[in-house]
């Protein structure tokens, strides 16, 4: 990461004896602060106000100086007007601005929806053994490991998410700190936020007083292997952890009794719609309507329907790559072992991602454990159980990225997702995949081919709609047009852009005058891959970015509706938010707008002014570290009880919101403790890697799910 820092002559006077003030906006000189990675700032009225644009980097601010923090055990940042962004990063560095690792310490600072908050982070005790182990766990998500070691227990009524973590990455010589930076990690939207003070607090910090577990002091030869025969973290215990196949049998019997006692909500039709609610016209498929001021989906029987269910209903959630780290695992089956089949079971939707990451040796711990639990015919048994579980738990949806054969059992409505991989805009980078050129004929051809590949789902009345693509990197209002200009002369969208400009300006000289460029002709416009001054070309860049977005959505809709007029086009699942131009374009062509919204609730969410469309949450989750994997996902909570309470509140906030027509949890089962293709190893399932339900979550699902429709109808 590139760090550009301000120079300060000396550190400010400490606020309390022993405290070290690293930054105070009330006394700082405006010339002492510089931005990093495209951010801008204003130092005024005792606040350092920072503006950050969408970026693939780490925009923020940084201060340099000379500080001895050896007598300090905690660092606190005073935020004002924290904005909508949920997590900032505080980074302390020794000399040289080295990357993550030696010479730096990174703290994740959670703040969401706060007008004013002081967020602090404890320095952990020095553990050289753990520092030696953590780098060997890459690419597994390791930022939360300090929570397991020094878990900062909250006060009564205080969420762990609202307390600061201990430093998660890197080592630091506290006696020679030279730089302090506050920034956002690759923001997708513009943000404005302010910092008043950054203070290192005297004392040891609360983390130093907490007992350190034995495994955190192990040497590597003691720590490895750290994954047991069931795919669980070997060195910790928690309720319902599996130690033998007999534990699986006991859990199966326990759940069977629970399902028999809870067959599902009353007053639902076969689709999970509101049979006791109003009768609307039957269309034979799923549609949308606004009833009593709120958006709804309508099921094929003409009943109001609100989508509630999990993403990735598959027996292969805990598939993990083995490349170069067989020593992580206490047991992997030998060739010829009956369980060697689980080297080849796979999550079909995510397998292309493993290939893209060049992860070809994999093992499926989740399917292995399910086979041990249910025996011969395990796949068929588990598939039928998945439908039974969902209805019992108050759900009516199998959300996208789930097992196709389970969806096609026609017992639970489902949505699917496909991705278009045609010729990309060569100058575009970022996101899961490069953005495809909608003006290239291959785009429509690929969109049409997908409807052929998914023909069974398109013809299935239980499939209510499709997401197309996922979490595109849209950038700013001019990004797609700038990406077009960076592309070669034969890029179709670049030729279309040339034609639009030629029609508008006629002569290249007029374009040059407006853009402050020096093209010799329209042919050179095509061949040049440098970009103009964005301010001079702003109007044209933004207009063509809109045209690309509209062409993208238009073609997808046309091909989807050509194949199946009765299926809903559910958009592309924006990551948290989306720039205005793509929301407006999607509103023209999508039946439902979709966002992946990782927040604690949705009460503050709103569409841009002038847009009134139904919204579907494609992903959300919360995790805790009292069970299973050592990563809690994107929102960390204290424990499973708090996760259950927060789940109820999130879904209730969506039910009370007039535009949400459903929420989809990510994901049905925990990810592998040893990580998937990109290292994700999150405790975010409704079941763990051994197929054991998290009973606190099940109770929460039923609490809100069984009253889904009365809650939606009443609302606010």
Region locations from a protein language model:
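Active-site clefts of carbohydrate-active enzymes
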Residues: 362-370, 426-436, 528-542, 611-650, ...
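Short carbohydrate-recognition loop motifs
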Residues: 40-58
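Aromatic-rich peripheral "rim/lid" segments of glycoside hydrolase catalytic domains that contact
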Residues: 483-495, 666-716
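Extracellular carbohydrate-recognition regions
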Residues: 17-37
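Substrate-binding cleft of secreted/luminal carbohydrate-active enzymes
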Residues: 461-465, 469-471, 635-686
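Glycoside hydrolase catalytic-domain groove-lining segments
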Residues: 543-558, 562-633, 648-652
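Polysaccharide-binding and catalytic clefts of secreted carbohydrate-active enzymes
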Residues: 300, 310-311, 318, 325-376, ...
């Amino acid at each position: 990461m590139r760090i550009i820092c301000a120079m300060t002559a000396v550190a400010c006077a400490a606020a309390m004896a022993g405290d070290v003030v690293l930054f105070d906006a009330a006394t700082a000189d405006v010339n002492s602060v510089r931005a990093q990675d495209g951010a801008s700032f204003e130092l005024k009225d005792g606040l350092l106000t920072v503006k950050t644009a969408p970026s693939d980097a780490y925009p923020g601010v940084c201060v340099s100086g000379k500080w001895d923090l050896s007598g300090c055990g905690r660092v606190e940042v005073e935020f004002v007007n924290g904005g909508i962004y949920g997590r900032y990063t505080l980074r302390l560095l020794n000399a040289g601005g080295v990357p993550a690792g030696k010479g730096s310490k990174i703290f994740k600072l959670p703040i969401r929806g706060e007008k004013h908050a002081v967020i602090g982070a404890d320095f952990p005790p020095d553990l050289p053994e753990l520092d030696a182990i953590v780098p060997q766990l890459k690419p597994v998500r390791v930022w939360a490991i300090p929570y397991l070691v020094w878990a900062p227990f909250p006060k009564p009524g205080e969420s762990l998410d609202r307390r600061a973590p201990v430093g998660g990455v890197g080592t630091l010589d506290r006696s020679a700190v030279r730089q302090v930076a506050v920034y956002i990690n690759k923001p997708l939207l513009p943000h404005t936020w302010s910092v008043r003070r950054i203070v290192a607090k005297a004392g040891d910090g609360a983390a130093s007083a907490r007992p350190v577990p034995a495994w955190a002091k192990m040497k590597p030869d003691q720590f490895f292997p750290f994954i047991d025969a069931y795919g669980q973290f070997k060195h910790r215990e928690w309720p319902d952890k599996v130690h033998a196949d007999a534990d699986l049998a006991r859990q199966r019997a326990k759940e069977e009794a629970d399902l028999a006692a809870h067959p599902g909500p009353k007053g639902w039709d076969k689709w999970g719609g509101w049979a006791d609610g109003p009768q609307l016209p039957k269309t034979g498929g799923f549609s949308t309507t606004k009833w009593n001021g709120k958006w709804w989906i309508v099921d094929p029987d003409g009943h109001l329907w609100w989508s509630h269910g999990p993403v990735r209903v598959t027996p292969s959630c805990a598939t993990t790559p083995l490349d170069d780290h067989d020593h992580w695992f206490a047991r992997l089956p030998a060739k010829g072992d009956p369980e060697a089949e689980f080297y080849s079971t796979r999550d079909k939707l995510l397998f292309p991602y493993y290939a893209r990451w060049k992860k070809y040796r994999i093992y499926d711990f989740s399917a292995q454990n399910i086979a041990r639990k249910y025996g011969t015919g395990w796949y068929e048994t588990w598939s039928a159980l998945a439908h039974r579980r969902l209805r019992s738990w108050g759900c009516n949806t199998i959300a996208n990225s789930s097992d196709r054969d389970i969806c096609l059992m026609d017992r639970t409505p489902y949505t699917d997702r496909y991705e278009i991989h045609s010729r990309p805009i060569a100058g575009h980078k970022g996101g899961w995949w490069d953005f495809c050129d909608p003006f290239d004929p291959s785009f429509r051809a690929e969109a049409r081919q997908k409807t052929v590949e998914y023909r069974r789902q398109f013809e299935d009345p239980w499939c209510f709609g499709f997401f197309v693509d996922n979490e595109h990197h849209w950038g700013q209002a001019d990004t797609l047009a700038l990406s077009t200009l960076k592309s070669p002369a034969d890029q179709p969208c670049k030729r279309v852009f040339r034609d639009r400009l030629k029609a508008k300006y006629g002569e290249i000289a007029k374009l040059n005058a407006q853009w402050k460029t020096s093209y010799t002709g329209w042919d050179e416009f095509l061949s040049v891959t440098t970009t103009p001054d964005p301010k001079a070309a702003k109007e044209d860049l933004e207009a063509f970015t809109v045209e690309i977005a509209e062409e993208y959505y238009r073609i997808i809709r046309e091909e989807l509706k050509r194949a199946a007029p009765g299926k809903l086009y559910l958009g592309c699942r924006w990551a948290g938010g989306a720039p205005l131009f793509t929301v407006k374009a999607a509103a023209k062509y999508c039946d439902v707008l979709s966002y992946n919204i990782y927040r604690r609730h949705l009460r503050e969410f709103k569409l841009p002014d002038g847009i009134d469309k139904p919204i579907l949450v494609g992903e959300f989750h919360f995790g805790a570290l009292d069970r299973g994997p050592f990563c809690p996902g994107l929102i960390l909570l204290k424990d499973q009880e708090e996760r259950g309470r927060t789940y109820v509140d999130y879904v209730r906030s969506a039910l009370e919101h007039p535009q949400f027509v459903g929420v989809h949890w990510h994901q049905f089962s925990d990810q592998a403790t040893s990580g998937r293709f990109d290292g994700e190893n999150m405790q975010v399932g409704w079941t763990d890697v051994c197929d054991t339900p998290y009973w606190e979550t099940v109770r929460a699902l039923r609490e809100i799910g069984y009253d889904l429709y009365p809650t939606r109808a009443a609302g606010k």
